[in-house]
Amino acid sequence: MRVVAGTARGRRLEAPPGSVTRPTSDRVRDAIATALGSLGMVAGSEVLDLWAGSGAMGIELLSRGARSATFVERDRRALETIRGNLERTGLVAASTVARDDALTWCATGGRHDVALCDPPYVFDDWPALLAVVPAPFVVAESARPVAATDGWGLVREKRYGTTVVTFLRRQEQAP
């Protein structure tokens, strides 16, 4: 697994040991980052990487010009991997790594421009996540499409093998 583009292009990334995480493939990571770039959601953005695993998705966006990234992960081995990957890519200064449950962190965390959500495939509480996620734009990786709940609109949806990537934008509320 490698960083696909940007300042850390070609740098090797490690995956956490065991089967606790499911790293996003280089191809899918590149497609997500390119799509976000075309929507103006990368350069200068503050990224939230939930269920961060190896941190590869947030690192990809940092490499492509995101201002900062917060990585939220519960597994200790995955957190060690994220920290190592940030050191390997030279992106530590633009990063915060938090050990917490994603939903718990969202209820108390700061505001971000885009949230990257790659929970375990068994996760099915998208309405609860969308109710508390502190970002107006969400990229969800799941085994099936994520439905836009009240207050959210579907921007784009694409299937990559067994992974469905859903882009959602928070809708403006009328006064």
Predicted ranges, named:
Residues 1-175:
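Class I S-adenosyl-L-methionine-dependent methyltransferase catalytic core
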